[in-house]
């Protein structure tokens, strides 16, 4: 009886499909057109969602005004830079300036300071990160800073990591927003309690860094077939810290909401573009928190800031690639910040 019932159901289903197909053939568009229409609607919905979120980013951007004084639109500190890695902190700090911060500081190891100073006279460089009193030297600047970017060019020297651990602790005590990238994320993977539950932290891991964090925090491998769920779960496990997983599409979550940034970029993946993202994010986080949830329509200010930084980085990548193709570097991308910012947020 079971076999007959199953066969009967299958026959009935086939009849229904045949009737629907005949009706579509006579009175409606072909099935492939229906599917194409459904896909187009979903794509249009996605584009609309992105545009709505970009509008929230526009809402948090402070207007330029001759009545403001130097420093009002952002004083950002970058913590990182060692003997081996001097480019990353420069990229992050100069990107912060290009996006619209008024002042950009770099707190680096003494060996990195002359090199970073030589890159740009516009950066304020402090050669203190490897000193015995590094935490105190950075802490005394915290009242003057609106946000920290921790990790670019940091390296994994034990003494530097201990100092950065102390800097993160005093920054949390002062309620300073922190963006954590690169080897700052390696430190967090070793000590997740450092930022657990700190709602003014944003983590910006790439695929490898995300996998390491996920395994350290959730004690198991991530589900490669469920990227959205993996980012959501990691954020929740960290106490709803905002997480930005960089990749073909950037996936963002604060443990309650998931956003996807699919702004067009390019197929070029040059080293350093993550530093552009972290530096610009430091500025946007400050602006978003200053603007408050009323300007973000109730959405998380940090999620809105992160979406803006991801969109900007991708747009810079796209514009630079149009000019330079395979030879595109992060310096080419940084040169596009002004035009990309205007295109996304000021048109």
UniProtKB/Swiss-Prot annotation:
This is ATP-dependent (S)-NAD(P)H-hydrate dehydratase. It is found in: Mitochondrion. Its cofactor is Mg(2+). GO terms for biological process: metabolite repair; nicotinamide nucleotide metabolic process. Coiled coil: none annotated. It comes from Homo sapiens (Human). The modification Phosphotyrosine is found at residue 85. Its main location: mitochondrion. Keywords: ATP-binding, Disease variant, Glycoprotein, Lyase, Mitochondrion, NAD, NADP, Neurodegeneration, Nucleotide-binding, Phosphoprotein. One of its GO terms (molecular function) is ATP-dependent NAD(P)H-hydrate dehydratase activity. This protein may be expected to contain an N-terminal transit peptide but none has been predicted. InterPro entries: CARKD (IPR000631), Ribokinase-like (IPR029056). Belongs to the NnrD/CARKD family. Residues 53-344 form the YjeF C-terminal domain. SUPFAM superfamilies: Ribokinase-like. ATP binds at residues 246-250, 265-274. Glycans are attached at residues 240, 297. (6S)-NADPHX binds at residues 153, 206-212, 275. NCBIfam families: yjeF_cterm. The lineage of its organism: Eukaryota, Metazoa, Chordata, Craniata, Vertebrata. GO terms for cellular component: mitochondrial matrix; mitochondrion. Its EC number is 4.2.1.93. It comes from the Eukaryota. It is linked to Encephalopathy, progressive, early-onset, with brain edema and/or leukoencephalopathy, 2: An autosomal recessive severe neurometabolic disorder characterized by severe leukoencephalopathy usually associated with a trivial febrile illness. Affected infants tend to show normal early development followed by acute psychomotor regression with ataxia, hypotonia, respiratory insufficiency, and seizures. Disease course is rapidly progressive, leading to coma, global brain atrophy, and death in the first years of life. The keyword Ribosomal protein does not apply. Catalyzes the dehydration of the S-form of NAD(P)HX at the expense of ATP, which is converted to ADP. Together with NAD(P)HX epimerase, which catalyzes the epimerization of the S- and R-forms, the enzyme allows the repair of both epimers of NAD(P)HX, a damaged form of NAD(P)H that is a result of enzymatic or heat-dependent hydration. Pfam families: Carb_kinase. It catalyses: (6S)-NADHX + ATP = ADP + phosphate + NADH + H(+); (6S)-NADPHX + ATP = ADP + phosphate + NADPH + H(+).
């Amino acid at each position: 009886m079971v076999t007959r019932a199953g066969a009967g159901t299958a026959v009935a289903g086939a009849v229904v499909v045949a009737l629907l197909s005949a009706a579509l053939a006579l009175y409606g568009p072909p099935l492939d057109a229906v599917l194409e229409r459904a896909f187009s609607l979903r794509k249009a919905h996605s584009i609309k969602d992105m545009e709505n979120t970009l509008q929230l980013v526009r809402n948090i951007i402070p207007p330029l005004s001759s009545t403001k004084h130097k420093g009002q639109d952002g004083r950002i500190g970058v913590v990182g830079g060692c003997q081996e890695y001097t480019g990353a902190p420069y990229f992050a700090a100069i990107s912060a300036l290009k996006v619209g911060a008024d002042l950009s500081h770099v707190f680096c190891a003494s060996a990195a300071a002359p090199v970073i100073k030589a890159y740009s006279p516009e950066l304020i460089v402090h050669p203190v990160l490897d000193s015995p009193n590094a935490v105190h030297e950075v802490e005394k600047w915290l009242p003057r800073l609106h946000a920290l970017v921790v990790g670019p060019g940091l390296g994994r020297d034990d003494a530097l990591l201990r100092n950065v651990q102390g800097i993160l602790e005093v920054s949390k005590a002062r309620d300073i927003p922190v963006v954590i990238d690169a080897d700052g994320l390696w430190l967090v993977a070793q000590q997740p309690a450092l930022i657990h539950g700190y709602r003014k932290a944003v983590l910006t891991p790439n695929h490898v860094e995300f996998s390491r964090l996920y395994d350290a925090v959730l004690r198991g491998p991530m589900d490669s077939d469920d990227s959205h769920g993996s980012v959501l779960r990691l954020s929740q496990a960290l106490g709803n810290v905002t997480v930005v997983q960089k990749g073909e599409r950037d996936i963002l979550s604060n443990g309650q909401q998931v956003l996807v940034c699919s702004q067009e970029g390019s197929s070029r993946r040059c080293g350093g573009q993550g530093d552009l993202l972290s530096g610009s994010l430091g500025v946007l986080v400050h602006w978003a928190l200053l603007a408050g949830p009323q300007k973000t329509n109730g959405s998380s200010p940090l999620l809105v800031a992160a979406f803006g930084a991801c969109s900007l980085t991708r747009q810079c990548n796209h514009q630079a690639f149009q000019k330079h193709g395979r030879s595109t570097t992060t310096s080419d991308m940084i040169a596009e910040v002004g035009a990309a910012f205007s295109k996304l947020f000021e048109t």
